[in-house]
Regions:
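Extracytosolic ligand-binding ectodomains
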Residues: 1-224
Length: 224
């Protein structure tokens, strides 16, 4: 269920390419194969010294979306592959070679890699699934930041955003004397990240919602 929202990225007549490197994330690969299901896909190994032509040859022309699933398991591999995709895209544009829309499916831990060129996230339309995301360009987040800085004199942390969400969802019920508020299973979006609380077989209630983060080449970030 974690990667359920990625399903539509692979639907229809898409050119799907799995890219591996020297170090790969086997667990992520299994999850992506499950999401892709019976849709056909290509596979390529890209490492330092690999001719970029190998990627160029796998790109579909105008009218077909290209979805690259990057399975590299470390920062070096991810950086190498994203740079190669960007280079191939630039080369094809320079040669006026028609290319379908390019999307990259990656991992949420990429945001913790300090040396990645974040502009490539936008250029290559990177998507990943995460348990929490707060984009400071979002209007709601910007408003929260402004009020938080006025009150505390510093920029809020990720824990500040999560704390705000918790108060918005549970504060009213707790103030009314209810230890646990009624949770209907509906999706709640206190700030930007969605939540869906459901009760499992053991009677425990927890958040089952995962957010799909998508960077757009128009320099926007959507979270759903």
């Amino acid at each position: 269920r974690r990667y359920e929202k990625m399903g539509p990225l692979f639907e229809g007549d898409k050119n799907i390419v799995f890219i591996t490197s020297d170090v790969n994330d086997a667990a992520f690969e299994r999850e992506m194969k499950a999401v892709v299901g019976g849709n056909p896909y290509q596979r390529v190994v890209y490492r330092k010294g690999t001719p970029s032509q190998q990627i160029d040859e796998m790109l579909a022309g105008s009218g077909t979306d290209n979805v690259f699933v990057v399975l590299a398991g470390d920062e070096t591999g991810v950086d190498l592959i994203l740079a190669a995709l960007s280079s191939v895209q630039n080369s094809r544009l320079a040669r006026s070679k028609r290319t379908g829309h390019i999307m990259v499916v990656g991992n949420s831990r990429w945001v913790r890699y300090r040396n990645l060129d974040r502009s490539l996230f936008f250029k290559l339309n990177v998507s990943f699934v995460t348990s929490y995301h707060a984009y400071r360009g979002n209007e709601s987040v910007l408003d929260f930041d402004r009020r938080y800085i006025e009150a505390f004199g510093r920029v809020p942390s990720l824990y500040s955003y999560r704390g705000y969400d918790a108060v918005k969802m549970f504060g009213g019920a707790v103030a009314a004397g209810n230890a646990v508020p009624a949770l209907s299973g509906s999706v709640m979006v206190p700030l930007q990240t969605p939540y869906r609380f459901e009760t499992g077989a053991g009677g425990n209630t927890g958040n089952t919602e995962w957010a799909l983060v998508t960077y757009g080449n128009d320099y926007t970030i959507s979270v759903r």
